[in-house]
């Protein structure tokens, strides 16, 4: 291969340069060999020549002269002189070739020189290139974030090492320029401390081996919205990587692998019984399965006779989350029938970021163990934002304490806000005004209607258990309300079956508004009438039926208010009734009481009234 005598490579993280083992160009872009005004010959991307070399131009002399142009592939495998001797020494010990040009399409033409440095120990793209070209693995940063003794910068923390590396390169005449770039960089989500990319040995689950099964199983799931299942999560599975399941921590589920201190033989222990058998000690079956206790259990290697110890890693907590469906029942050791009856789950719900979290861990483990999806229906939730649409953060001071919100507005009001505000998968701007508005429109109206009934039922000593709702004797208003009631129950039932949450909430709200603002207002004189004539009894029974039935339909959404209504209207009068509204069946639709023609006519009348009221205020 032809050596490169002078190339201009760019790098953002200077502390990685001592670990450099290759350069990388984009195979699809054009590169040039140029003679620059400073007397040096450079290789770099054609699109970036003016950006990088333009400042070398003089009044009577251009910044550079193009000697050759060629595709990026022409540079592949060309060798260059290592920046640091320590990297060459490390590569030689591994008997691997390095310090040549590689190709990958991740290299961009937005900044730098179009030639990037490669250090496989520091970054996913670099690691991928390293695997593709079987590059040496050089890692001159320790776990404390300090450069190691092999480098000229031993003991210096990585962030402080950047200027030292630049000084060293400049002193050796190998630094062309050190411009500042603004770029995205990972920070700790809790304290905003900059992180460092760092490769370390891990245990993996080879998910790539079951990629097709993962995609097939995901296609059986009803995702709401479908765009998440087919798009975000589907794309994640299309590009699935092997899952690094080990963590170097003290806490967590210990990785159940024992390794021989002599020959390296490894065994995966499948349970307490097997552990006791291998240890030759019945007490091992009772050991606390966490560190440090589990680490004390050792046994003899069958290959060389030396001692086998548990490896020090623990398991990623997301692996625990994916094991939830069977681990909660101690399956497969017991409760086999219970598990099989309840798996897969009919429905789960979590936030959109769980496409890489719980949704993934459940799907991965279910596919690996049972080759089927672990859930049938998924509602994906959008994130809760502040009233300005910003992500809530304690550090920014815009986070809402959920306990304060519950204290101020009540659980039902907050639940109702999320149901009625927007589709579940869209972000929600949470603020008090929106909660109280929903509380007023629906919950306040329902409660006022209930209070109206209770007030006059107590005055008249009306007991609904002593009367029967006789449909043939009902007025048009009564029949209309019952028709609206069971049309609403039917709509709510169908919407919930299809996971249409806002539609369900709006159907309930619409009915409650009609019941309060039209039925009760038009029928007040009937409740005020003297005695207990048939018409008055019909009004009471109609309103009672509507209140109890709509409360049962709304109970999953506003459990506390509906429970309060049920306790007073039902349990207080009927000792044989279920002790809670949440132990009742969902209301059954009485199709024979649904009169769509009557509903249409009443809707037209309501529209006329609304228009008439509007004209009054003109």
Question: Which residues does each predicted region cover?
Answer:
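Conserved oxyanion/phosphate-binding beta-strand-loop segments in alpha/beta enzyme cores
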Residues: 61-65, 69-106, 193-194, 198-216, ...
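Secondary-structure transition/capping motifs at alpha-helix termini
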Residues: 90, 131-140, 167-177, 248, ...
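Acidic, turn-prone loop/beta-hairpin segments
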Residues: 460-490, 521-611
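Conserved phosphate/anionic-ligand binding catalytic regions in large, soluble enzymes, centered on
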Residues: 7-26, 188-190, 249-250, 254-255, ...
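Alpha-helical recognition segments enriched in aromatics with Gly/Pro capping
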Residues: 133-144, 249-251, 274-427
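Active-site-adjacent bridging/hinge elements
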Residues: 94-107, 139-141, 211-218, 325-342, ...
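Protease-associated
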Residues: 18-23, 29-115, 124
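Residue patterns forming the tRNA-binding/recognition surfaces of aminoacyl-tRNA synthetases
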Residues: 1, 7-20, 32, 74-81, ...
